[in-house]
Amino acid sequence: MSKNATNTGGKCPVMHGGATEVSISNMEWWPKALNLDILHQHDSKTNPMGPDFNYREMVKKLDVAALKKDMHALMTESQDWWLADWGHYGGLMIRLSWHAAGTYRIADGRGGAGTGNQRFAPINSWPDNVNLDKARRLLWPIKKKYGNKLSWADLIAYAGTIAYESMGLKTFGFAFGREDIWHPEKDTYWGSEKEWLAPSGSEGSRYSGERDLENPLAAVMMGLIYVNPEGVDGNPDPLKTAHDIRVTFERMAMNDEETVALTAGGHTVGKCHGNGDADQLGAEPEGAEIEDQGFGWLNKTKRGIGRDTVSSGIEGAWTTNPTQWDNGYFQLLLNYEWELKKSPAGAWQWEPINIKEEHRPVDVEDASIRLTPIMTDADMAMKMDPEYRKISDRFHQDQDYFSEVFARAWFKLTHRDMGPKVRYIGPDVPQEEQIWQDPVPAGSTDYDIQAVKDKIAASDLSVSEMVSTAWDSARTFRGSDKRGGANGARIRLAPQKDWKGNEPARLSKVLAVLEGIAAGSKASVADVIVLAGNVGIEQAAKAAGFDLTVPFSSGRGDATDEMTDLDSFDVLEPIHDGYRNWLKQDYAVSAEELMLDRTQLMGLTAHEMTVLIGGMRVIGTNQGGTKHGVLTEHEGTLSNDFFVNLTDMNYTWKPTGNNLYEIRDRKTDKVKWTATRVDLVFGSNSILRAYAEVYAQDDNKEKFVQDFVSAWTKVMNADRFDLI
């Protein structure tokens, strides 16, 4: 209850404020605290489906033919409450899908269409997503009908694909299998700006230097998907906009040809909406009144639908026939000269000079009215930028080629964050594998696992070498876009074999041994690398008095150079690894924050992170063999010594440099150990210390080993989608 609520004669029976209102959070009181909440998202407490619900199994029961029929019908069934432009919702549905998928960025794999996050803040209320709430409501009868067999994430992505089909494009295919989340992600960094559409140079700007966009961002402004359609900071200049386009599309793994295809293909159909006063629009969905029921941007002053809709503020269609897949975009863009104009809403747009009457698109509600087509500053970049122009000319001259390139690029856009093809479900999954899917051939399970382990144990490899190599192979996994991991053994290929973080000299030595063992059996190198890590852990556990077998699932395959897109793997290169106590260089972000981000991408919880780091320290897996954080007299033994000594009050901690500390005996002041911020945070952060104390207890030595093995196995199997 609010303290400003009307007094109705009695006191509110609910304790004021704290539980239901947004009060000052711990992170606001203590901004330097670690936000461990990012490790504890999307659990059973927020998911209404129950622990036994498996969407990937449920969607296999979906009647795709019936769904497709219903989706095609929806496209042309205009609703009075939100009219379809020209009687077809295709343009709206394409924008819906595009703006869901278009949040993906390759730097950290976050964003994209894979979770249905467009339903939640902040994305559902971004200025670039004005009126997409209406598109989702139009889809609700479909979602309601197919229920648990169809996620919102799949439906939103599918809507654009069906829209293109209904307007004449031969699509490349579609895969189901995206699982919904039930609250906004807490781990995705969208920028530091304090206002929507803040221009460059404003407080918290994402730009520095000569228009260098901050990593990992892939949009030019807070609240946009890609670029500002009016120009850089709203100032039209197609060549400057071309620079922004190239950067943003590269950051979502698109080359120049794919960029032109997606820009042109996205604007071949549909229109922009700006026929009115944007100031008359109500609040966005998250800020709207309760009676608006999740609708935002309502125009309660004017009609606000059909020809009077205001979305981006730009007004008009790009082509003569906006409900047909054709070559009209390039025909108008390249055959006419264009001049700057202002839309009725006051937005900059380009309009053709002396356009022929037959090239004018008709009004969305009255076909007897002809209107002027438009281009955005981004469209003009396709004509003015020399490289984009070459591609545009080719597409203009060869409609079939344009259609093929676009269909493939659209498939890539809407599936980029789904991971390898093994995760694809449905009758329309293309047979052809794409290199951006990071293909891995099937591996063998027909070999004697124990015999391979015996050969590994008999080699001269140390526990540290075996565990470190297996870890390095697996740590590249990102749950965000399902890339990386141990499957494929790409650690033996360029570029990974040469990454500084993989210690090329040590890696080469270890791989020479493990590849020889693999060659002498039917096992893949990928399996042997993981098995070697398991052997090392078993030896370290035995040294601590625990005889155990680390779980193992065979069947990993070995990728080849031909299956590996070198450039796309650069973003997976580790530039830090708290688990091996290593930083490639000093960064503005603290070492413990970097560790937290990597942990979230790997899909680990806070206690799994805790037990893994404590175990890897005492095993001796530090990068370069450093002794920082190795808080034990028995290196190579899987003991709980790290936590015992970390929580021991007989020691004090003193800084000796940037990210370096000495642990000194309180009585003698003699240096006992050295450590980094990543080590110390498990004693300083109250939550992590609580976990550290659990593992330091005298009665939890076995629990520590068991939990370490469980977390280790989770990392090794993170990319084994064939086991799910």
Swiss-Prot record:
Cross-link Tryptophyl-tyrosyl-methioninium (Tyr-Met) (with W-98): where in chain: 226-252
Cross-link (Tryptophyl-tyrosyl-methioninium (Trp-Tyr) (with M-252)): 98-226
Top EC class, one word: oxidoreductase
CDD domains in the record: catalase_peroxidase_1, catalase_peroxidase_2
EC numbers for this chain: 1.11.1.21
Modification(s) after translation: Formation of the three residue Trp-Tyr-Met cross-link is important for the catalase, but not the peroxidase activity of the enzyme.
A GO molecular function held by the record: metal ion binding
Catalysed reaction equations from the record: H2O2 + AH2 = A + 2 H2O; 2 H2O2 = O2 + 2 H2O
Listed Pfam families: peroxidase
Keyword Nucleotide-binding belongs to the record: no
Entry keyword Iron: yes
InterPro entries membership: Catalase_peroxidase, Haem_peroxidase, Haem_peroxidase_sf, Peroxidases_AS
Site (Transition state stabilizer): 95
Function per UniProt: Bifunctional enzyme with both catalase and broad-spectrum peroxidase activity.
UniProt protein name: Catalase-peroxidase
